[in-house]
Every structure is written in structure tokens, then in C-alpha cells.
Amino acid sequence: MGEICPRREDFDIDYILKNASLLEKVSLLAGYDFWHTAPLPRFNVPSVRVSDGPNGVRGTKFFDGVRAACLPCGTGLAATWDQSLLYDAGVLIGQECLAKGAHCWLVPTVCIQRSPLGGRGFESFAEDPYATGKLAAAYIRGAQSTGVISTIKHFAANDQEHERISVNAVMSERALREVHLLPFQIAIADSAPGAVMTCYNKVNGQHLSESKEMLDGLLRREWGWKGLIMSDWFGTYSTAEALNAGLGLEMPGTTRLRGPLLELAISSRKVSRATLDERARTVLEFVQRARKAEVSAVESTRDFPEDRRLNRKLAADSIVLLKNESGLLPLNPQTLTSVALIGPNMKTAAFCGGGSASLQPYYSTSPYQGITSQLPPGVEVLYETGATSYAFIPELEASEVRTPEGQPGLRMRFYRDPPSVQERRVLMGFSNPELDRLFYADIEAELIAPATGPFQFGLAVYGSASLFLNDQLIIDNTTVQRGGTFFFGKGTLEETATVDLVQGQSYQIKVQFASGPSSKLVKPGVVNFGGGAGRLGMVQVVDPERAIARAVEAAKRADITILGVGLTRDHESEGFDRSHMDLPPAVASLVTAVLDVAPDAILLTQSGTPFSMLPWADLVKTHLHAWFGGNELGNGIADVLFGVVNPSGKLPLSFPRRIEDTPTYLNFGSERGQVTYGEGIYVGYKLLRKSPTSCALSIRARFVVHLLCVLRFDGRHRVRYTECSKLGRRGRSGSSPAVYRGRSNNVVNRTSHQGAQRISKGGFAAR
């Protein structure tokens, strides 16, 4: 960790509010830049840094940021059902914030996953509001124990990405309070986060960032909450309305709807001086609390052994054993002579979801790396991809190309003028002050073909771009553009071209790029982050039938087959929702083909939210589900497979067989600017009673033999039970009993609330 940033002397808030000018007070109510609050040097008020990242602290860059610890995604953490473990995870996050120079962490997300298709569903915890609130509170308490401020978000019902800044979420008062507000209410009461972030969407006709009823009425007066209320990034839509409603801080800076507009609102008496002072006070109190965190003076790293151990435990304890019908698990590596490791997720370290969850990890471990590291020498490993599962063509790696100067990677040059202008002047750096909103760039590299055969190139862009190979145009993403999911949903569809290459031959790559304002796309309801973005990919074309045939042959030869399939951040991301629950097309064919020749194959699936398991759901005998598992994904999986850790994870979400079986099948996504929450309070398992949310098995085949529930005088319940195990093997042991609490014989239909807590038993399983 870098040198500690020196603290400034404290400041007197009452004195500032009495003596600061109108312009100074107004300046406090919007960000200074993308990641910092505005300072008041005259009063010794510093600028404080905020940082995003639901599974790690990203720092101040969207791309190529400082490396960071990556924890399992929110649903993975929730699968542990372990509040003390989430507290420890929060402490690690807080320490990462300090290393990155961040006073405030813009997490956690507690919006309920009402549909499996929600793009950011993996960021939140569980479909049960009580469980989500309790787990979030533990996470927040851990982070804030380091002095860092935590920001709970997105208040409220921000559970879909489709037209997220304009969609109106229409629901009953009961559904709003019992499902979508309850996680916030519980977490705020139990952990006192330093800030609340409002959502992009409307609820019952009004944007939350300008709802006086929700911010001043419910959050402030009814719940008695005193902290800062900030907007989501570019989620402020008015000046006077938002300020009068209770929104203290517009983010990011520089301001769009405050500054001179707020000065005008005050002079025209649409906003009173008293209201201005109230909002300025909440910002100053936030800064005063945040400045006490002992943050690093520069963005730095802290990849310590104890952090790795905790992250490995988080990854392992989140894994859910869904089936062990043949009793195959745990595997004894000493008895194996050959292992087939098959599937597109086997060598892919799907450690995080997309969007705000993306970061540069200190390191990552794929399932392949984790499994092979625990195999004895001499065990034959048969690896086959079997199928492709990417939604975007894999990005060009620096090792595959070199700059015109001979260095690994691509060279990018920025210009104010388009390529048609003669003798353009190169401007150094993306943040050059001479660059206008509309700017241009040339990206160049030399590619040495790694093999002979057809290769597919892909180009997606926010802005416009064209790809040339040896001066020949192969992809035009400028003249005609089709809307896609790239860059938070603002960009184009990935356009592709297939070209035959010869191994060892040199090819010149050039991309002509223009920034965001050059885009021809008009997308309602999508956040505009400005700037521009592009993605360039290349992959060798693989015949799907041959790939499956090779995988089948490997499965026939091996003692044990482990099949790794699932989703990645290409499929689950901020900015877009999934259009279906299916895995990539070739994956289902791969699974059924392998199970046909190796019926005892171990299936390892990965995702942050539910996916369809048809047509192989009833064929597989041994099934583990892992999540986006962070840095230690592969090691955590291997620990469970080989019995180092007993899988105690439970599903925090219902995994329906088909999307048609979900309560939100007919009412998810914006239709004419509105989505109706027709399921009411019956979200997830509350409707799917026959498929309990917390379903899972344990290798040690535990069962309860005695159960006693006592209602205490203080109104709390105490549940006591005796648990036995049929198997015992050395390794970490534990269980996460799930308890459903509800009322019976009610005139009004009521749903249960779910709670659970992990119970550990030391080195051996109880017998």
C-alpha cells in the first residue's frame, strides 16, 4: 500500500454554512469530476474520492485500471449465507478502498432479482428481501469498520437494464414496501451506511431522485436516516425538483443540472436558501466523516497472503452442490490416472460479471488451473474446449500483436480532425485538453498469424469505427450501425468478418475510430457516459461438430470427466438484460453428448443468475454450481471437488427450468416506457413453493434428527437442531441451515422470510 494521504485540519460545518458564499455552497452539491467531490479550499474542505465495484474496488479508470482484489459476485457471497464471512469480506473491501485512495465505496447493490434475465442480478444478494438486507448489512459493517463509507444502492427497484433511465416501475404499495424497500430498510437500520444512491428509473410515475415522498418522507422522516443521498452517475434529471426532494449530491462532475441552473432556481425562489443549506450540510457531514479514512495518497495495490486465503474461502464456501446421486464426490486425487477437463468455462477464468463489476484483478485462477494444481504428478489431463460460449469475439491479446515500434500491443493516436484532413496533428493522450467531444483516433498493429485457417474478427463501438486488414476494409461499423449491448448498452452490435490467415505471415491491422458523438444510434432510456469506446476481437473459427467429437473422445478415455460450462461477463452485465435463459447454443449439445458417453461426468456450471438446464437437467448425476468466483475461483472449485472443503452453499435464487415458469415471464422489460410488477409480493421462491430457493446438498449427506423452535420473551425465535452425517472425511466442514419464517391462518395472504447462518464444525465432519 502506498503512502498515507495526509489529513487536513477539521472544519466547522456551522461556520461554513454561515460564511460561505452562494456559489461555494452550490459547488458542493455536484461532483468535482467523475470520482471526486468538490473541495472548498477557503474553509479547508477537501475533495474526497469515491470508487465503484460490487466485487472489488476498481479505482478511477474504466479500462486498464490499477489491479485489485476481486471477490465473488453478490449472489455468490449470498450463497454462503454467512454473515460473519460477509463482514470479513467487507473488511477486505474497505482495505482495498484505502489502498486505492478511495474514501467511499459505491456498494452494495440490494435490488431484488425479480427476473433471472436482469443484467445486474449477479451484483445483488438474494431474491428474498430479508436475507438480502441482513447480508448487505454485514458487508457494510465490515467495510465501514476500516473507516471507509459504504453507499447502499440503487434506491429502489432498479432491477432491469432495459431503458433503465426512463422506465416506470409500477407496483402496489405492499409490493414496494415488503419486497423492494425492505432490503434497504433492514440494511440501513442494522449497519448505518454513510450514503444512499438513488436509482435511474421511475417508481409509480416519478424518478426516485426527485421524489419528495420517497427521499424526504420515507427515507428521512419515516426511517429517520440522516446520511447523504447521492444520484447514480448521470441519474439527476432536474434542478429544483431533485434538490427539494432531498437529493444532496449530483454525480458525476462537472455538473449538468446544478451550478448556474441551481443559482437561477434559488434566485427565482424555486429552491429556498434553507433547503440549500440542508443539502450542503449533508455533503459536508459526508466529507467530514470520509476524510478520516487513512487512504493512500496514490492508487496502489495490497495483494497479501491473508487476503488470498480469505478470497479462497469465499470462493469455496459459495459453491453449491446440486446433485451427488452417485456419491462420486469428493474425488480422491491419489486414485486417478486420467482426467478429462472439458468445456468453454474450464480454461476461462470467469471471475466477475460485466459493467461496473469489471476490473483488473491481481491475478485469476481458472477451473483448469485450480484442478490441475491439486492433481498428483503423472495424472494424464485431457483438455478439450468442446464448444464456444462467448457473446463477443475474444479480445485481441497484447501478445498476439505488436506496435509499429515493435512493442507488444496496439498503438493509438488521437486527433481533433477526421482522416480526410491532410497533415493531422497528433494529440498526446485521451484526456488532452485540445480534444473536443468529437475526436478521432487511429489504432494500428502488426498481427503474426498464430495458425493457418479461417479467423473471425469482431468490432463493436460506441461512436463509429472501421477495421482494415492490409489496407483492405473488412468491417464497416460507421456507414450503417445496428444497436447492440456494447458499452453499457450505448454501443453497436458487434460486426464480424471472416478472413483466411496463413501461420507466421504478417498482417497490418488498422482501426479508424471516431468518438461517441459520431454514433448514428438513438437509444432511449440508456445512460450516456460520454467519450467513446471500442472492442476489437479475433478468434480462430472452430467447427462445432468436430469440437464436440474431440470432447466426446476425451471423455471416453478418462477415468473422470469434469465438464465446465456456463456464462461469463459477456452474458451478464450492466447495460443490458438477457433476452433468454439459455446457455450458448453449442453448450447444450456438448453437455448431452458428453453425458451420453460418460454418464457419471461431473458437471460444473458457472453464472451469476439462473439459466436453463434443459435438456440435460435430469441426465446429470453430479452437479456443482459456482458463481463469478473472484481471484480464487479455480482454487475454490478444486477445494470442493477434492474434499478440502465441504460444499455448504445454498442457492439464494430460484433456478426455474424455463423462463416461462417464472413469475415475471409476462412483465419484464420496458413496454412503452413502463413495466408492471404483476407478481406483486410473490417474487421467486414465494411463488415457486415446490422449488425452495436454498436448495442444495452436502457431500457429507447430513440430515436433521431433532428440531426445536422456541419463541422467546423478547419476540425473537431460537431454533435448535441436531445434525448427523453419513460420511466423514478430513477437510473444512460446515452447514448453512435455512429457516423460513411466516404466519399461518391469515386473512391476508402472507409470504415467508428467509434467513440462514453457516455453522462450522472444525476439521472433521460430525458423525
UniProtKB/Swiss-Prot annotation:
Name recorded for this polypeptide: Probable beta-glucosidase K
Gene source species: Aspergillus fumigatus (strain ATCC MYA-4609 / CBS 101355 / FGSC A1100 / Af293) (Neosartorya fumigata)
Keywords, in A-Z order: Carbohydrate metabolism, Cellulose degradation, Glycoprotein, Glycosidase, Hydrolase, Polysaccharide degradation, Secreted
SUPFAM superfamilies: (Trans)glycosidases, Beta-D-glucan exohydrolase, C-terminal domain
Domain of life: Eukaryota
GO terms of biological process kind: cellulose catabolic process; glucan catabolic process
Location within or outside the cell: Secreted
Classification lineage: Eukaryota, Fungi, Dikarya, Ascomycota, Pezizomycotina
PROSITE patterns reported for this sequence: GLYCOSYL_HYDROL_F3, PA14
Annotated catalysed reactions: Hydrolysis of terminal, non-reducing beta-D-glucosyl residues with release of beta-D-glucose
Primary enzyme class: hydrolase
InterPro entries: Cellulose_deg_GH3, Glyco_hydro_3_AS, Glyco_hydro_3_C, Glyco_hydro_3_C_sf, Glyco_hydro_3_N, Glyco_hydro_3_N_sf, Glycoside_hydrolase_SF, PA14/GLEYA
Residue ranges of every copy of the PA14 domain listed in the record: 405-552
Feature: compositional bias, Polar residues: 743-757
Similarity field: Belongs to the glycosyl hydrolase 3 family.
Keyword Oxidoreductase: no
